[in-house]
Amino acid sequence: MSSENTGKSSLNSFGARDTLTVGDQSYEIYRLNAVPGTEKLPYSLKVLAENLLRTEDGANITKDHIEAIANWDPNAEPSIEIQFTPARVIMQDFTGVPCIVDLATMREAVAALGGDPNKVNPLAPAELVIDHSVILDVFGNASAFERNVELEYERNAERYQFLRWGQGAFDDFKVVPPGTGIVHQVNIEYLARTVMVRDGVAYPDTCVGTDSHTTMVNGLGVLGWGVGGIEAEAAMLGQPVSMLIPRVVGFKLSGEIKPGVTATDVVLTVTDMLRRHGVVGKFVEFYGKGVAEVPLANRATLGNMSPEFGSTAAIFPIDEETINYLRLTGRTDEQLALVEAYAKAQGMWHDPEREPVFSEYLELDLSTVVPSISGPKRPQDRIELTDAKNAFRKDIHNYVEQNHPTPETKLDEAVEESFPASDPVSLSFADDGAPDMRPSAANGATGRPTNPVLVHSEERGDFVLDHGAVVVAGITSCTNTSNPSVMLGAALLAKKAVEKGLTTKPWVKTNMAPGSQVVTDYYNKAGLWPYLEKLGYYLGGYGCTTCIGNTGPLPEEISKAINDNDLAVTAVLSGNRNFEGRISPDVKMNYLASPPLVIAYGIAGTMDFDFESDPLGQDSEGNDVFLRDIWPSAAEIEETIASSINREMFTESYADVFKGDDRWRSLPTPEGDTFEWDPASTYVRKAPYFDGMPAEPEPVSDIKGARVLALLGDSVTTDHISPAGAIKPGTPAAQYLDANGVERKDYNSLGSRRGNHEVMIRGTFANIRLRNQLLDDVSGGYTRDFTQPGGPQAFIYDASENYKKAGIPLVVLGGKEYGSGSSRDWAAKGTVLLGVKAVITESFERIHRSNLIGMGVIPLQFPAGESAASLKLDGTETYDIEGIEELNSGKTPKTVHVTATKEDGSKVEFDAVVRIDTPGEADYYRNGGILQYVLRNMLKSSK
């Protein structure tokens, strides 16, 4: 990190620079008490205040900015822009590969414009964990892990060689190889410092990450959040992150959770509360006496779900529990002493008696939390477990009946247009016939839509599938697999289930993908692996797997039965996202649940199940076995944690974390400061963003004669815009791979090909569940191509190429919460590469809006209360947008004037709100994007 980022060159207007002595070590620090007013700030804003004090340069960060945060008005709407300099950047491989591709391309662009390519180097430590590429091709047997890793290397060798080149070519860039763990778990267990030391200066650890669940580290008191890959690249290159001083929601925790309630239940309850309250763009900070009762692992689970709450961060302050966790996970005694001394010196140590001032207040009595699941399509759709069967029976109608009306939804909820119901099926209602000994998902189906399908399977025997069958049960995802209480709870439940003679249903694809190798160690030490394996939960891989759609194919006979009979089947996973189409293309309904409940639903085999009154099976004596009979007690879980987890597990697991296995070490790795691009590569291609870029930006211009590429509904996620999953044969992305000699079995996923813009542009707006309202009853990556007579249906990519040839700019129209979900920079990159100049919506989710600006696309909002529907816009119009050119004079217009001319010549006119929110964002937009801005600044500073 450059000296200006550590504080060595701070202007120090407040005389805050001082020395902190801990043991026999002395550190330079910037004391917050030098700035009056900071003592009353919430913890999260103290971290920001210190950041500004230390990086004050008189230009980007001034004395006024520091005073603005010290005098923070909790009741004001955010309006003051500050420049936050994160201490480090963390990445996963799907988003990290394109970052390193961009940096490699920037080196060449700098050289081409006469600069020094070695100027392009991370100034902040950057760490990348490879966790997104492992796919569960093999499951349910002892060879699953080894075989899945083998296949991962076969598919991804090119990408991994490229990352190894990057590790050698760039300073301060490290890669954690595949098969180690999930990025956020590796972050809390090893990478996070809580207090950083660099150049002799001690300061709070902060980070930005190229994954929206970066907020997991908030549980350790580390302020950090997900940003798009483009912002992460800029942060690596020393650019501060532009932000408004946020509102902070104080979330008071009191009471203790009841027996039988898990951390997952707490986080689903908090998600539900915060979504209802509305926390988009705000910090959430937990406080109160109840904080001490929340184990660090549970804090990390709560922090992890911040994107699902809608908040920028969801943070816990530092206290004794933080220190205990750092000790358990193998941090040094010197580090522990520094964290405690620094936090106490800066007023950052949690004092339960002191109530900071917050903008808004919420409270949860933990004793009121009940077991819950969430589904069938959004994390905030919480269902109490006692009501799960009823809720499923209501929801199933939306997936099996034609034109079933979707109930009216609240402002922030998805509507029919965005998330289509399935095609109609032939409905039948169950009759009680003669008993059948085959396992069946249609038992007790009276009163709900049912379509029993007999499946013959050589491996699994004969069984009956039906609507609601659980075909995926995944213990997966960073959210829960780092949490010993739920992971050991699940394993103890498995032990009791096996002892009672229960088994997982034959149609369930099981998955166990822990977030780090430590989980495997404590399962082994506790002697619980054999029970999990008996129920089918063999180690499948250390990575995201099911949670990001790397579920792998369902067994062929099951997939065929589902698709031939249009069954609405379900997945249950211990993840954080359950959007439609995300988990598996065969599965329509997805539910989030705690790891123990994942196992329970795998045994039940259907969502049409009431755990209170329906037995999971019978024991050897024929007695009914209910969930309550196998649920482990809190005392059992605590005893197992105490006897099976120790510090040595962490120190041994992470001793050689960057070294990798033989496969990693034997990868042939190119060398040199610039990368030798392979023109035949279908994984890694030189990025096109700097092609023909002049040293000075050209003026921005108004948009004239634009056409609509897509007219979309509410809650369109970044996964709809740039899916990460499988590449469908026959689509433009598949056609490109076919033309380049790639066999269908080697297509791999869109996420794994993010280093190749040719594949990614063809995959943009290509999610199988996306509904473009320019077309009736069509899902997937299609639009109308108005360059052709009559505007026929065409692939979005093919139409965009025709518009490009004709010199016609494009716009996208959307609804509420456009761009929610993952911090997926390709959702913005793909948009700009398709020729889209503006996106007009009712509202944007935070990260995607800033990513669009970062790629030179202007985000606009309909006037308050208006929408495409209310303005009677159907997407066939031609659009002129005037007022953008005002940006050339250094001013950002509040609105621009949009004229939509219909085919009959009539006009619809409105003033769209310009969502360029800060002066820094205006600079990026004027330069055509953030990377172009950084590159031009680099050239200026090297002259």
Swiss-Prot record:
Metal-binding as UniProt keyword: yes
Binding note for cofactor: Binds 1 [4Fe-4S] cluster per subunit.
Protein name: Aconitate hydratase A
Top-level taxon: Bacteria
GO biological processes: tricarboxylic acid cycle
Cross-link (Isoglutamyl lysine isopeptide (Lys-Gln) (interchain with Q-Cter in protein Pup)), chain numbering: 394
Documented EC number(s): 4.2.1.3, 4.2.1.99
PANTHER family: ACONITASE/IRON-RESPONSIVE ELEMENT FAMILY MEMBER
Function: Involved in the catabolism of short chain fatty acids (SCFA) via the tricarboxylic acid (TCA)(acetyl degradation route) and probably via the 2-methylcitrate cycle I (propionate degradation route). Catalyzes the reversible isomerization of citrate to isocitrate via cis-aconitate. The apo form of AcnA functions as a RNA-binding regulatory protein. Could catalyze the hydration of 2-methyl-cis-aconitate to yield (2R,3S)-2-methylisocitrate.
Cited Gene3D superfamilies: 6.10.190.10, Aconitase, domain 3 (3.30.499.10), Aconitase, domain 4 (3.20.19.10)
Stored InterPro entries: AcnA_IRP_Swivel, Acnase/IPM_dHydase_lsu_aba_1/3, Acoase/IPM_deHydtase_lsu_aba, Aconitase/3IPM_dehydase_swvl, Aconitase/IRP2, Aconitase_4Fe-4S_BS, Aconitase_4Fe-4S_dom, AconitaseA/IPMdHydase_ssu_swvl
Gene that specifies this protein: acnA
Pfam families in the record: Aconitase (PF00330), Aconitase_C (PF00694)
Gene Ontology terms for molecular function: 2-methylisocitrate dehydratase activity; 4 iron, 4 sulfur cluster binding; aconitate hydratase activity; metal ion binding; mRNA 3'-UTR binding; mRNA binding
NCBIfam families: PRK09277.1, PRK12881.1
Keyword Iron-sulfur: yes
Positions of [4Fe-4S] cluster binding: 478, 544, 547
Renumbered residue ranges of the record's region Disordered: 422-449
Organism field: Mycolicibacterium smegmatis (strain ATCC 700084 / mc(2)155)
Catalysed reaction equations from the record: citrate = D-threo-isocitrate; (2S,3R)-3-hydroxybutane-1,2,3-tricarboxylate = 2-methyl-cis-aconitate + H2O
Metabolic or biological pathway, per its Swiss-Prot or TrEMBL entry: Carbohydrate metabolism; tricarboxylic acid cycle; isocitrate from oxaloacetate: step 2/2; Organic acid metabolism; propanoate degradation
Cofactor: [4Fe-4S] cluster
